[in-house]
């Protein structure tokens, strides 16, 4: 009412630009239009709440100086993403022309993305196809789920590469790129990714009967998911 004094504490302004940082990168291929980088586990792809530095974008700006601007100030050059704890291949656009070409391929599901995943348990079959819509979890907004009413179609194809009795190494191809898709689908399959603290993998370690295997799994400081192959058509050449 009239005469009241109102004090307002405003949150600190978010930075409007990303500062280049001299962070080592493993560049597997680079030309004038794009580059392919092997992102390490534990690195966030681009700045967001709680992660204003130390991201892949910070490192890329130091390495390249200039990237495609289509993704905006905080996501220059970023055409697709990997989860923080997932390692592996990412293609980055250095020019707007390359960005548009690559983004179109991802939108049309023309890019072939293959992962390796170490999962708990010994699958009963040598492979399979999972077709379950993935969307935001109905009660936990930080998780994804196949029980969401607003889920989007998602397809995951997997096959066993090696069996270790208490675990298995899978080769996983995704025909869609939904958030946490592989982790959610493999958990629904009954074989969560080793080291995945969100979708049941961390608690599953208590069921591993082999002490040596359990110790090795417990020593992992990340989820055992790696993007090891990425096939696309060069957007320029």
What is each residue range found by the language model?
Residues 1-237:
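RNA pseudouridine synthases
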């Amino acid at each position: 009412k009239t005469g009241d004094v109102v004090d307002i504490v405003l949150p600190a302004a978010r930075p409007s630009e990303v500062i280049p940082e001299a962070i080592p990168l493993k560049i597997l291929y680079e030309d004038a239009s794009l580059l392919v980088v092997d992102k390490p586990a534990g690195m966030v792809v681009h700045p967001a709440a709680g992660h204003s530095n130390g991201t892949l974008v910070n490192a890329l700006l130091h390495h390249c100086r200039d990237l495609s601007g289509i993704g905006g100030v905080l996501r220059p050059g970023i055409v697709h993403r990997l989860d923080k704890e997932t390692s592996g291949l990412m293609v980055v656009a250095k020019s707007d022309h390359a960005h548009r070409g690559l983004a179109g391929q991802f939108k049309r599901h023309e890019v072939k993305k293959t992962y390796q995943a170490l999962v708990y348990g010994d699958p009963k079959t040598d492979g399979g196809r999972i077709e379950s819509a993935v969307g935001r979890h109905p009660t936990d907004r930080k998780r994804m789920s196949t029980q969401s009413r607003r889920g989007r179609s998602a397809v995951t194809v997997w096959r066993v590469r090696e069996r270790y009795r208490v675990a298995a190494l899978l080769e996983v191809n995704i025909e869609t790129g939904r958030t946490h898709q592989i982790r959610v689908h493999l958990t629904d399959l009954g074989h969560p990714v080793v080291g995945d603290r969100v979708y049941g993998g961390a608690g599953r370690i208590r069921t591993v009967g082999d002490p040596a295997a359990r110790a090795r799994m417990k020593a992992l400081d990340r989820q055992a998911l790696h993007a090891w192959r990425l096939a696309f058509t060069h957007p320029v050449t």
